[in-house]
Amino acid sequence: RVELTQDGVAYSNLDDLNTDITCFIENGFCRFNVNSHLVNINQQSPKQGEVLVEVNYAFSEQGVSISVERCNDSAYLVLPVIASPKEEVRISTREASIKKNKGILYITCEAGYIDVAPTDSDGRIFNPVPGFSFAPLRIIPESIGKKIQINIYFC
């Protein structure tokens, strides 16, 4: 999801009831284009007015690419990555990796940089429903209005 917090209120594209989603197959990729706005749970925009968000997903056998076009007004991509406290997590500004039982999950950042939201002492947040711990990654654009681009794959 794309999120913006302003005066303690979260505005997210997940809350937008007027989201437009298109799906198509192209060159072996299953693509989803999602056009929405950042709104709070009451469908209200931030004080500066409508904030348009375009998120594009490209799924392939190798993994998934996610891009956010024109990430405006201090918004960022929220990426909660499931990671048990026993799994080794490494995070830099351009790459994150989580060592799983059967391989390594990689997240590479081509545009923007990786940040970690506040966590518990083990570097994760526990969500009692559905019962998973996760590393709360945020992908921040280099500057307002810039693109975010990440790739996720498992080896």
Task: Describe the residue ranges of each PLM region.
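Compact beta-rich and alpha/beta scaffold cores in large eukaryotic transport/transcription complexes
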Residues: 1, 6, 91, 100-102, ...
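Residue-identity detector for threonine
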Residues: 5, 19-22, 93, 108, ...
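Acidic (Asp/Glu-rich), glycine- and aromatic
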Residues: 51, 62-101
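Beta-strand-rich recognition/accessory modules
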Residues: 80, 101, 108-155
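Catalytic and substrate-binding regions of extracellular carbohydrate-active enzymes
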Residues: 1-73
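Generic structural motif
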Residues: 7-9, 37-41, 60, 71-73, ...
